[in-house]
């Protein structure tokens, strides 16, 4: 076996190695296990508490282990006596004590912000999805867990671990020196989140609401890109059709692959990947 930290060390190094391979540079590389991030998360959490945005209660709901996400029953598909997500992932009913963020209080503020800042969420189709989701009604968000021990402990209640909504999203602030954002203020003011469409709700609903609740400004823009399929099929480990970036770069060249990925599909749309498509695009355009 391998400890969680050892496993994540290995995964982290894989990403660092890949960045070198694709000739990509970054000003910071942050991991949520770092001390600076734990400090930032605790300060952010305490700020929400000080602003009366967090309370302790009990959570009951449908939970997807794979997605690390809770679902409302109306979002699920019932098959026999079980419930499944749209991606056919089975969910489980979970009951546990949890801290909650008062997300429901920020429904109108979010809708007003979307209206006043029409370019905040891109592309437009994703913006419409988010607005529709918020208009359907927001429930308070569970932001802690007692069912696992890996993660950042809640101060004054060590039985609770901060959930991913806090732990993962706050890393954007950690990398800029939060709580002191003065030195890198311009970076936050011009910040653009480029994310997968599957995590748009977290970035365009939960995150802005928490930032508002913590009296912080919002990122300038959130751009949700689409998904790639592999010759018409969803890419997954179970299908064995995951594309090895090292293999494809070595076969066709880095610049060629980079050109294909940006040229083949309008940014924001879904696209289909195939070696035939790569060859056709390279031969036609380069």
Name each region found by the language model:
Residues 1-55:
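N-terminal Rossmann-like or analogous alpha/beta NTP/dinucleotide-binding catalytic cores
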Residues 2-7, 48-51, 74-81, 240-243:
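Short, structured secondary-structure boundary patches
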Residues 5, 13, 27, 82, ...:
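Short non-domain terminal segments
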Residues 14-22, 63, 198-207:
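Low-complexity, flexible helical/coil segments
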Residues 17-24, 46-56, 68-76, 119, ...:
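Alpha-helix capping at helix-to-loop junctions
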Residues 19-20, 81-82, 261:
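Short, flexible segments with low predicted structural confidence
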Residues 31, 36-40, 44-47, 86-286:
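Structured secondary-structure scaffolds
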Residues 51-107, 111:
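Cys/His-rich short segments
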């Amino acid at each position: 076996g391998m400890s969680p930290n050892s496993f994540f060390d290995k995964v982290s190094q894989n990403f660092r190695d890949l960045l070198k391979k694709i000739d990509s540079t970054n000003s910071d590389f942050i991991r949520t296990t770092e001390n600076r991030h734990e400090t930032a998360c605790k300060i952010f959490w305490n700020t929400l508490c000080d602003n009366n945005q967090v309370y302790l209660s009990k959570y009951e709901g449908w939970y997807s282990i794979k997605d690390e996400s809770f679902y409302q029953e109306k979002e699920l598909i019932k098959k026999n006596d079980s419930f499944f997500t749209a991606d056919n992932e089975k969910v489980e009913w979970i009951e546990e004590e949890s801290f909650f963020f008062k997300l429901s209080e920020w429904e109108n503020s979010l809708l007003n912000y979307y209206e006043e800042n029409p370019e905040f969420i891109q592309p437009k189709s994703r913006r419409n999805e988010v607005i529709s989701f918020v208009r359907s009604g927001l429930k308070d968000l569970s932001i802690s867990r007692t069912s696992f021990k890996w993660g950042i402990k809640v101060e004054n209640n060590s039985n609770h671990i901060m959930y991913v909504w806090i732990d993962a999203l706050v890393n954007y602030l950690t990398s800029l020196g939060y709580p002191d954002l003065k030195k890198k203020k311009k970076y936050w003011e011009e910040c653009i989140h480029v994310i997968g469409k599957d995590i748009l709700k977290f970035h365009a609903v939960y995150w802005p609401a928490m930032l508002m609740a913590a009296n912080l400004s919002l990122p300038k823009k959130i751009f949700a890109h689409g998904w790639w399929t592999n010759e018409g099929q969803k890419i997954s480990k179970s299908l064995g059709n995951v594309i090895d970036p090292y293999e494809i770069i070595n076969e066709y060249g880095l610049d060629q692959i980079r050109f294909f990925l940006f040229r083949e599909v309008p940014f924001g749309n879904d696209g289909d990947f195939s070696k035939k498509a790569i060859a056709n695009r390279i031969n036609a355009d380069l």
